[in-house]
């Protein structure tokens, strides 16, 4: 069993994976003085028995590293996985300065790229098992990525240098994170990234139209659930034809991955679903239903 949690952190992203091995992974953060204490205490509690904790930064955007200095102060980051960049900002926040400090640290930083390997991210040895995390993008030699990196390093948008992170529970569900990749960029790299059927996909750019996952990707991913993050409703794309969970309504979303099933829990007790199977799961509060992991392509969805 493993746990994947998506925090409701306003217009930003923050996740963790409590692996079924000796690993704990945090993906992005968006903390402030009001929320940091409770969030960090949960991270410390959930990771306390894990030998390896890593932080994966998808890209250098304020709402994906906000409050990282608060996290690092209370829960020191020893393994910082990041796309290599020299991003610049017209206004440097304390969080950006701290991000740069971690990014450029010769000991703590590990620069991720398509197909990279590392103990114990995706390699196993006699000490501990793999986390099951793989990096599908960026291809640092791809010309479109190089253009996006150049723009980012010159003070432009960092969205299209986002890492694509893919997690697989052995014999169970798969989960994908896309950072803030934009639709046009995803279309450009369709033939240069390996995509396979994925159980749960976190929509790019918090579900905004600007990060709508193109059909060319959705056909390969064939997701059972698309999670739409927090953004103003007028900017969201609701992915007609697919089952979705919207963080604006659900609040924190906790996914319990058990064998070939995923049980879903939310922090909003008023949020209900009738299109998920009732397995009677009760590990956490506010259970809303479950899915059984598909292994064959269906290319059929249901509006939710």
PLM regions and their residue ranges:
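Active-site metal-binding motif and surrounding structural segment of the metallo-beta-lactamase
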Residues: 25, 33-87, 192-208, 219-226
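Core dinuclear metal-dependent hydrolase active-site scaffold
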Residues: 1-50, 114-197, 251-261, 266-304
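Active-site environment of divalent metal-dependent phosphoester hydrolases
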Residues: 11, 33-34, 60-65, 86-90, ...
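Active-site-proximal beta-strand/loop segments in catalytic clefts of secreted hydrolases
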Residues: 28-30, 57-60, 83-85, 114-116, ...
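Conserved glycine-bearing catalytic or ligand-binding loops at nucleotide- and phosphate-handling centers
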Residues: 92-129
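Metal-dependent catalytic neighborhoods of phosphoester/phosphodiester hydrolases
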Residues: 65-74, 90-100, 213-218, 237-240
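Hydrophobic/aromatic beta-strand patches that form the interior of the parallel beta-sheet core
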Residues: 5-7, 25, 56, 81, ...
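Long, structured stretches of catalytic cores involved in phosphate-ester chemistry, encompassing
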Residues: 97, 190-263
């Amino acid at each position: 069993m493993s746990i994947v949690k998506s925090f409701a952190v306003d217009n930003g992203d923050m996740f963790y994976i409590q692996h079924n091995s000796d690993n704990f992974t945090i993906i992005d953060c968006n903390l402030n003085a009001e929320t940091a204490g409770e969030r960090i205490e949960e991270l410390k509690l959930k990771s306390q028995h894990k030998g390896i904790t890593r932080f994966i930064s998808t890209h250098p955007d304020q709402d994906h590293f906000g409050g990282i200095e608060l996290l690092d102060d209370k829960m020191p980051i020893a393994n910082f996985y990041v796309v290599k960049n020299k991003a610049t900002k017209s206004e440097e926040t304390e969080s950006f300065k701290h991000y740069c400090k971690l990014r450029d640290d010769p000991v703590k930083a590990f620069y991720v790229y398509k197909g990279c390997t590392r103990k114990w991210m995706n390699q196993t040895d006699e000490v501990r098992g793999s986390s099951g995390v793989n990096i599908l993008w960026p291809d640092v030699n791809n010309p479109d990525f190089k253009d996006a990196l150049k723009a980012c390093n010159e003070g432009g948008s960092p969205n299209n240098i986002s890492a694509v992170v893919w997690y697989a529970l052995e014999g169970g569900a798969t989960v994908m994170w896309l950072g803030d990749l934009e639709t046009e960029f995803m279309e450009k790299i369709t033939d240069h990234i390996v995509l396979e059927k994925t159980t749960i996909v976190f929509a790019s750019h918090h579900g905004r139209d600007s990060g709508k996952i193109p059909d060319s990707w959705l056909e390969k991913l064939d997701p059972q659930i698309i999670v739409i993050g927090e953004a103003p409703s007028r900017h969201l794309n609701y992915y007609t034809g697919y089952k979705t969970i919207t963080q604006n309504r659900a609040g924190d979303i906790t996914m319990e991955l058990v064998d070939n099933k995923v049980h879903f829990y939310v922090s909003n007790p008023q949020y209900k679903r009738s299109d998920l199977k009732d397995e009677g799961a009760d590990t956490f509060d506010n259970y809303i239903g479950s899915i059984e992991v598909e292994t064959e392509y269906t290319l059929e969805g249901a509006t939710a």
